[in-house]
Structure formats: C-alpha cells, structure tokens
C-alpha cells in the first residue's frame, strides 16, 4: 500500500484530456508524479500496470501546460462587460469608456494573468496610450508579445503616421530583454487602417521580423462593407475619423466577391504572414489564401458570441492545416481573461470537434503564434500543479 505521508510516494493523476506539449493530445490520459518530478505519462491503464503501487487521483478535466491567451486588450481591463452587436459595440462601449484605458488598467490585467498562471499573452496596446507599452515591457512576470495598435484611415496621412509608429517601435525594441515580452505591431483592421498605412506597416514588420496581428472578418457586416462600401459598420463609424468613402480607405472600389482576406492578400499584406484574429466570416477561398500564406489565426469564442459575430469555422481551418490559437479578447467583450473559459465555451460551440484539438490549440497554437515554446510534461521534468486546469 502506498504511504500517503511519504513525499516520494508515486501519484497517478488521471484526466479526460492530456497534452504534454509535444505531438497531439490524448484522451484519456495520465501522469505519474514522484517527489515533484514527472515519472511517466500516457494511457491510464498502462500507467496503472507499470505503477501498481501509485495512489490514483482522478483529477478529470485537462492536464496540460498553462494555456496561452493569444489575443487580448489588457488596457481595457477596467471596462464593464457589455454584449452588443459588433457594429454598435465600438461606438457605444469602446469609445465612451476610452478614459478607462490606462496603465493602471493594463497592469491590473497583467496581474490577473499572473494569478491565472497564464502561459503567455498576445496583448494589443492602445495607440493613444503608448505609456502602456513601457509599463508592460518592464514586467518580469509577463511573457509573450505586446502588439502596438495602429489606426488611421486617411491615406494622405499614412507616411507621417508610419514615421511616428516606427520611431516608437524602435525605442521599445531596445527595452526588450531575454525572457520578457517582445514588441509587435497590430494594424487594427483592414477597414480602420488605410491601404497606404497598412502596406507601410506590414512591409516594415516583415523586414524587421516583427510579429503582426490584424483583426479580420470578425462580423458579417464586413461583407457589405467590402462588396458595397456601406452597411452597419460604415453607418456607425465615427465620421470625423474617416474619408468620405470607404473606397478611399482601401484604395479600390468595393465589388462583389471582395472580402477582407482577399483585399489583404491582393494588397500584399499576407506576404508578411500576420496572425489573423477572429476570422469568423470567411469564404473557402479566404481559407485557401490564408493557408497558402502560412498565417495562423486566433479565435475568441466568447467575444464572438457576445458581439453576435457568428461561429468560427474551426473544422475548415483545421482541414486546411492552419494553426489555430485561442484568445479572450478584452474583458469588455469576452467577460474575463481566463482562456480556459474560452476552451470550455469552444467545446460547446464545436461539439463534433475533438476536444484534444481545442486543448492543443490553447497551448501549442498559442505558443506558435507568440514565437515561444510550451514547457513539456515528460519524464524527468519538474511537475507543476498549474498543469491541472481547474
């Protein structure tokens, strides 16, 4: 009989899904832990046979390295959660509460991620609060990528905007340190960044090896914007911040069959292999273009549901071999910064999708988006109770 008081007595932890950080996940799974060290992983039945004296603990759920929050907005962590259609949510929620976007809010969000034991973060730093970047770069308990957000719909102002953004990025990159957050760039969306600025930013990022994130194909109303140049997004825009027509923003006439993904591809932006956020309302041709470019995508299941965006076509992206990661988006639209809640919600949205695929995406997919590496749960490695997703 195993002595429960013996610190070297083996424990057999069994779960519904095990992902060790290598290969694919398995279900069910188990981990044998001896004295704070992983002794074995694998099928529970095989582990019972190999370690008959181990004390078994049915922990259920998931055993895996901590999940990565691959897309969020930490400086919105003091916003109130509000569910509204996407095209109303920005003018009615984001803009009126913009005074809440601050260093204090971002640090509060970073504290929350630390307390959650997050495996890393892809954070969008608000363009008009650059001091947030300085504050987050200094955090020693934060890893991942801090993407400086760029907006600007007027093509004739693109060069001046680009110079300012480049100067800031170059200063921040000098503050990077081993093990700390990296600096990235996020041209907000194809319809809030002019064609000229979008191309300048993405060409620069590609040349400098800067990680990129772009919000793309989030809401169904984007289809009307790119095919007709109008619709709810255009009707609810903040008019002083836009030229007279949408055609001026994208540098071409809207037309039937034009999608945000096709527009970015034909503009040359996908050559920079940006990570594409949301990608809910896409066509089969869009998916082919993304796969050909080698871009990864991040899905934010709860946020997409709350903003009435639709359901991410996960199976189609998986079939095309596209890397998928998960993010919470901001607390204002997602509800919390705990990406494990998005994993659980994704399992309800995609009942026919193997849950092992979703767990792997939350870990391996997130690390691949951020250019980092997940810790491994394997023989000889230190055991961490944070590997139990509760």
Language-model-detected regions and their locations in the chain:
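Histidine-centered catalytic micro-motifs
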Residues: 65-77, 211-220
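Active-site metal-binding motif and surrounding structural segment of the metallo-beta-lactamase
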Residues: 46-64
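N-terminal metal-binding scaffold of metallo-dependent hydrolase/deaminase domains
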Residues: 1-50, 372, 388
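Active-site glycine- and acidic-residue-rich loops that bind
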Residues: 125, 186-202, 216, 220, ...
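Glycine-enriched alpha-helix->loop->beta-strand junction motifs that scaffold or abut catalytic
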Residues: 140-144, 204-211, 269-272, 289-298, ...
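Active-site gating loops and adjacent loop-to-helix segments of metal-dependent hydrolytic enzymes
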Residues: 77-105, 145-148, 220-271, 346
């Amino acid at each position: 009989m195993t002595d429960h008081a013996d610190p070297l007595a083996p424990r057999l932890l069994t779960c519904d899904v095990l992902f060790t950080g290598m290969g694919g996940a398995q279900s069910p799974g188990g981990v044998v832990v001896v004295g704070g060290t992983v002794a074995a992983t694998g099928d529970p039945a095989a582990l019972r046979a190999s370690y008959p004296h181990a004390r078994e603990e049915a922990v259920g759920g998931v055993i895996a390295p901590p999940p990565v929050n691959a897309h969020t907005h930490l400086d919105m962590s003091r916003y109130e959660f509000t569910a509204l259609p996407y095209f109303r949510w920005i003018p009615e929620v984001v803009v009126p509460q913009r005074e809440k976007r601050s260093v204090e809010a971002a640090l509060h969000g970073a504290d929350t991620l630390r307390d959650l034991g997050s495996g890393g973060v892809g954070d969008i730093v608000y363009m008009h609060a650059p001091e947030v970047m300085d504050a987050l770069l200094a955090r020693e308990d934060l890893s991942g990528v801090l993407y400086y957000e760029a907006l600007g719909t007027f093509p004739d102002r693109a060069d001046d905007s680009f110079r300012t953004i480049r100067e800031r990025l170059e200063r921040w990159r000098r503050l990077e340190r081993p093990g700390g957050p990296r600096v990235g760039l996020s041209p907000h969306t194809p319809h809030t960044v002019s064609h000229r600025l979008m191309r300048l930013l993405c060409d620069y990022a590609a040349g400098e090896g800067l990680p990129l994130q772009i919000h793309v194909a989030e809401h169904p109303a984007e289809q009307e914007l790119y095919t007709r140049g109008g619709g709810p997004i255009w009707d609810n825009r903040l008019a002083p911040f836009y030229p007279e027509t949408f055609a001026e923003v994208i540098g071409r006439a809207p037309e039937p069959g034009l999608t945000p993904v096709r527009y970015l591809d034909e503009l040359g932006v996908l050559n920079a292999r940006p990570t594409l956020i949301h990608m809910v309302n896409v066509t089969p041709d869009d998916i082919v273009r993304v796969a050909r470019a080698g871009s990864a995508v991040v899905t934010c299941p709860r946020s997409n549901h709350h903003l009435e965006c639709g359901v991410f076509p996960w199976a189609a992206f998986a079939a095309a071999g596209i890397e998928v990661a998960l993010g919470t988006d901001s607390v204002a639209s997602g509800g919390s910064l705990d990406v494990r809640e998005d994993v659980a919600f994704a399992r309800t949205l995609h009942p026919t999708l193997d849950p092992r695929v979703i767990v792997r995406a939350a870990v391996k997919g997130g690390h691949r988006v951020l250019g980092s590496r997940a810790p491994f749960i394997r023989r000889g490695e230190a055991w961490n109770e944070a590997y139990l997703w509760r």
